[in-house]
Amino acid sequence: MLLLSAVKTLLLAWLGIVLVFMSIIKSAMLDFLQEAGKLEGIETYKKEAQTSFMAPSWALGHLMGRK
C-alpha cells in the first residue's frame, strides 16, 4: 500500500514538473513570436522607405529612429 502511494506521489510530481516546463516554454515562445513581428514591421518600413524615397539601404539602417 505504501508503494502505491509513493508511485502516485512521484507521478503527480512528474506531471507537475512537466506542466511547469510547458508553461515556461510557451511564454518564451510567445516572446520570440512578438519580437519576430516587430522585426517584420521594421523590414517592411525599410522596404517602403527605400522605394518611396530612393534612399540607399545603409542609410536607412543607420539613421532609423533618429530625429
Swiss-Prot record:
Keyword Signal attributed: yes
Gene Ontology CC terms: extracellular region
Major location category of this protein: secreted
GO biological process assignments: defense response; neuropeptide signaling pathway
Expressing tissues: Expressed by the skin glands.
Signal peptide: 1-30
Methionine amide modification, residue list: 64
Entry annotated with the keyword Transmembrane helix: no
Annotated compartments: Secreted
Xref: Pfam families: Bombesin
The protein, known as: Bombesin
Organism in which the protein naturally occurs: Rana shuchinae (Sichuan frog)
Taxonomic path: Eukaryota, Metazoa, Chordata, Craniata, Vertebrata
